[in-house]
Amino acid sequence: MKVELKDKERIDDLQRNGYQIIQNPEKFCFGMDAVLLTGFAHAREKDILLDLGTGTGIIPLLMEAKYHCSHLTGLEIQEESADMARRSVALNDLQDRIDIVTGDIKEADRIFQAASFDCITCNPPYMIGQHGLTNPEEPKAIARHEVLCTLEDVVSRTAKLLKPGGHFYMVHRPFRLAEIMTMLVKYKLEPKRMQRVYPYIDKEPNMVLIEAVRGGRSRMTVEKPLIVYQSPGVYMPEIYDIYGY
C-alpha cells in the first residue's frame, strides 16, 4: 500500500520479506539493539505478542517477518512515532496482523487484558532519570532515558500481561544487570537465558539480551558472547545473519 511521507521522513528496507519501515532521522531511528533483540527472541506462529515502547514499530515488523505470529501489538506513548509505525504497518499491508496502540507503559495493564500475551518484548530506555539532558521532551531523550517510564514500570506491567509460562525478552545495558535480575525475580519473571553483546572481541560488553519466563523454574543459561564487529565497519558473520544479509 502506498502511504504518505511527512517532512524529513524516509523509507528503509528491512531486508526481511521485502518489509520496509518509515523513519525520520531527525527524530529517532531504530538501532542495532532492537535488531539483536529480535534475533535473540523466539516466538511461535500461534503466539500473541506485545512490544512495549515500540517506537516506529521495528520489533513487531521484524518479529512478524521471522515468526508470522498470530497477532502483534506495539504500544507507544509518542504519537508521532506511533503514527510512523502505523503507516509502516500499512506500507507492508500488515494491518490485519499488527496493531499500533498509542499509550503509556505505566497504563499498559489498564489498556490490555491481564495474562493475554504469550510473548512480550521491550527495548526500554537505558539511562536513569534526566541526568545530562537539555530537553527531556525530545523523542531521542524519551527513547534513551527513563523520563516517562522506569525499569520497574516495564517489568511490573509485563508480569501482569504475560500468560503463565509466557516469555519476556529485553535488551539493556550490562551496568544495570544486578538491578534487572533483582527486578525480574521480584515480579516472578524467572531469568532463563542471557547473552552479552560485545562491540569487539577485546572490548567490554555494551549490551545484554535477557529472556525471562513468568513463573519459570530457577535455572538460567548464559549463551556464548555475541561479537558485533570483526574490524571497523565489518560485522561478524552472526550479525549479518541476524540482519538478514
Regions found by a protein language model. Name each.
Residues 2-45:
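Class I SAM-dependent transferase core
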Residues 15, 43, 94, 185-188:
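Short, structurally constrained coil/turn elements
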Residues 20, 71, 97-99, 190-193:
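Conserved beta-strand segments of alpha/beta enzyme cores
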Residues 23, 102-103, 172, 195:
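Short loop/edge segments at beta-strand edges and connector loops
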Residues 40-133, 156:
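Conserved SAM/SAH cofactor-binding pocket of Class I
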Residues 124-153:
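Mobile active-site "lid"/loop adjacent to the S-adenosyl-L-methionine
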Residues 148-199, 203-205:
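Conserved Class I SAM-dependent methyltransferase catalytic core
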Residues 204-245:
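SAM/dcSAM-binding transferase cores
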